[in-house]
Amino acid sequence: MVQYAPFLLGKFSDPLLAIMVGCLSYYVYERKMGRPQGHHLHELIKKRWDDRK
């Protein structure tokens, strides 16, 4: 029988925490690298979302 590792915060809270930490770390990475105007993640997502409509 397989024994699962215990949860850090909870069954649903752990994945949400992982997503939040990942998004925050990518935000810090983008700020550190100094990406050119119009090439930030939120701008690219917004552009793709607007093209979809």
From Swiss-Prot:
Its main location: membrane. It is a single-pass membrane protein. Keywords: Membrane, Protein transport, Transmembrane, Transmembrane helix, Transport. It is found in: Membrane. GO terms for cellular component: cytosol; membrane. It comes from the Eukaryota. One of its GO terms (biological process) is protein secretion. Belongs to the NCE101 family. This is Non-classical export protein 1. The gene is NCE101.
